[in-house]
Amino acid sequence: MSTILKWAGNKTAIMSELKKHLPAGPRLVEPFAGSCAVMMETDYPSYLVADINPDLINLYKKVAADCEAFISRARALFEDANREVTYYNIRQEFNYSTEITDFMKAVYFLYLNRHGYRGLCRYNKSGHFNIPYGNYKNPYFPEKEIRAFAEKAQRATFICASFDETLAMLKAGDVVYCDPPYDGTFSGYHTNGFTEDDQYHLASVLEHRSVLAGFCVDHAGA
């Protein structure tokens, strides 16, 4: 199953191999949600899905809460707004409007992801999404993926939190899948990046918490 979003480092293509390293357990915990490919390709009784990016978590919450309303509004936008000037107008509203609802911000986030350059997700130091227009002829509207996600999401809790906060919520028996951002990648880790110090801190936290949970850490840059 493909994911709702285009995403750098999406694990869909390697899930058949990755699943061999994920033990059984009552709950899968993901401190770095990304595209949610791991949630979509596994079958745990429940999930705790976290990310520090509020736009990402807002999207997942809105799709889970009202899949049909989300599809209706997003599909209309995809049908009518594949133009450069419209893309930048939507990006402007997404970044600066104080009146935009969380629902519309989720719709816009999907639109920007699918119409922006290479599906990248990047913010400037002010926290503004700054990916340029991708100039694609016919961006794919992931209706099938949205419906599948909404169904699986009924088993999940989505939180906007740092990896520290997420790992502090572990319970005995949890399975943790960690795919931290690569050092120095174009996509970054929200506004502040993910530094070498963050990598060491994550390793320390995982070691401290290992008595509670089983871990699978996937990081080509480690």
Predicted regions, residues:
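Short active-site oxyanion
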Residues: 24-27, 45-46, 153-157, 207-213
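Short His-Asn-centered micro-motif
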Residues: 31-32, 50, 159-161, 178, ...
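Short, polar loop motifs at secondary-structure junctions
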Residues: 32-37, 145, 218-221
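A residue-level signal for conserved active-site and pocket-lining positions in enzyme catalytic cores
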Residues: 18, 34, 60, 110, ...
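SAM-dependent nucleic-acid methyltransferase catalytic core
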Residues: 1-13, 21-24, 66-177, 181-189
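Conserved S-adenosyl-L-methionine
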Residues: 10, 21-79
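Conserved acidic-Pro-Pro-aromatic motif
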Residues: 172-222
